[in-house]
Every structure is written in C-alpha cells, then in structure tokens.
Amino acid sequence: MPVFGKEFAFLTHYERNLRGGSQPILAQASDGLLYVVKFNNNLQGANLPFNESIGSELYRACGLSCPSWKPLLVTEAFLDKNRDCWMQTPVGRLRPSSGLCFGSRFLGGDGIRLLEILPGTSFKRVRNYQSFWLAWLIDICAWHVDNRQAIFQEDANGGFDAFFIDHGHLFGGPNGELRRNFQASRYLDPRIYQSVSSQQLQSFQKIARCLDVDQLWQQIQTLPDDWKTASALDGFGQCLDRLSTSNLLQNIVDMMVEALRQANEREESKQRSERKLSFSVLCPGIQGAGLEHNFVENRAGYPACA
C-alpha cells in the first residue's frame, strides 16, 4: 500500500555520508533522483522516521515549503555493497537496518545553489521570510526541541526561497521524551524574523486552527507499522490539540513577539559594543592618517549537504 499516496523506490547508488546526528547519507533511488536518507535504526531514536515524515506533511498542510519525501527501500544487497554508509558508533560500525526508511528529496545539483547559512544582510532577499513566523508557531505546538533548520535556494536574480528541513526533533524529539523552552525551536539567527503585521500573525493562527486533522490521521495509518511508535503518536495528538486551541495560539504568538523584541535589542546592543571596541583598539596614528578598519561578516553562506 502506498505511504501517504507515495509509491516507494529502492536505493540503487550510494553517493556520500552527510553531516548530522542521525548520520544520514546521500543516495540515488530507482526513480533516478537523489535523496537524503535516514535509517530506521539511526543513533538518535526510534521516532525519527515518524517525525520526519509527519513533520513534512504537517508543514505542507500549513502551506510551508519542504522538500518532497518518499519511503525508500533499503535492501540487504545495497548494505552489503556499500559498507561506507554504515553508521559509526564508539564501538565500531553499525549496519543500517533494511526495509522502508525515510528519504527527503535532495534539492541541490544541476547548478542549483543551496545555502545553509545566510549573512544577515541577505535575509531581505528571502521571499518567504514570513514563513519563519508560522514555522516557529507550528514548532512550539509540536514540541520541537531543536533549532529550526532551513536551507536557502538561490535563483538567477539573487533571491532566495527557504525550505524547512530536519523535522526529526518534533514531538518531543527522536525518543519523544524531551521538553524545551519555546525559544529552543526558533531559527538560530533572529534577524530572519522581520516585521510582520498583526493581521499576518492572525492569519498564521487561522492556518493552524483550520488544519484538516482527520485527513492527517487517516494518512498516518498508511505509514509502516514500525514507524508508528506510541510516543510519536501521542506527541502528534498533543500537537494537534494545541494547534486547535485559539487562546493558546494567541498566547504563544504574544510570547514569540516579545521574545524576538528582546533578542533584537540584545543583538543591537552587541553590535554597538563591538563597534565601540573595534574603534577603541585602533592606535591614534592610524586613525589620524584617515585609515579605516574593514569589518567583514564571517557568516557567509556555504553549500548545504543535508
């Protein structure tokens, strides 16, 4: 039976290992496409396949951009042939389990430029920057216990589209038992959260409240049985309850706005202090000569691999 209406493909060619605690790999499947593959017996936890797949579907249901995903069949023959894809542990190599695993479509290749980190000056070129507000709202309701991850795809005109990735720490994490402060799930650089109107914030709450919950539950039934752990299902159910509670959503939005206001104040204060410090270390002779010190942002983007 198709999973979420998706026919599975099987892995055919191992490309390379990727960064990340789950030790994902990049591999080609029988449909000719490249995928970021996360094995079921990954070192992070048993809930990872559920969290990744349902997290992607939840985000898509809210109108947020995510790479498409597909169940991928890992065969024993593939594992025998590609021992480099085996996971590393303190006591040696761990053979991945065979069977259906989660695969997220790789968005790079064919001259497409992907960035994992943008310099702050480039955030204004992100077309869907407002999506980060909605993503944070969803993540708080879903008990996301890690910073929100995103990659940025650049177009020919220098603009960026953000795609949200790595949902494995939703619903209390890969084992379902973690809880964090609501700011833990924020995108790491607060400058991406540019100003939004109160009407836009209200529209985000409406999107969350109007989810087709019954359809999501029906689709979950198509997942492989070993993906549907009790703690993952419970975490997802609690997430939907929070998303449907209007007063709670309003309280969360208020906390988000206040947290971002404080974060921006701290960032501005830090930048002012750095500017004062940098000019104070220049010797009078250099300053008198009219020479200036160039400060270059070091957080330039670099190609993404997961």
Feature names for model-found ranges:
Residues 2-114, 141-145, 179:
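Conserved ATP-binding subdomain of kinase catalytic cores across diverse folds
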Residues 18-22, 92, 120-134, 200-205:
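A short, terminal or domain-edge coil/loop segment
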Residues 40, 159-306:
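C-terminal catalytic region of ATP-dependent kinase domains
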Residues 48-50, 57-61, 90, 123-129, ...:
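Short, surface-exposed linear patches
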Residues 57-58, 66-70, 132-139, 192-202, ...:
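Short C-terminal domain-edge/linker segments immediately following a structured domain
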Residues 71-74, 147-152, 208-215:
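A general structural signal for short secondary-structure boundary/capping elements
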Residues 79, 155, 182-184:
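Residue-level signature of transmembrane alpha-helix interfaces in integral membrane proteins
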Residues 110, 115-177:
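Conserved kinase catalytic-core segment
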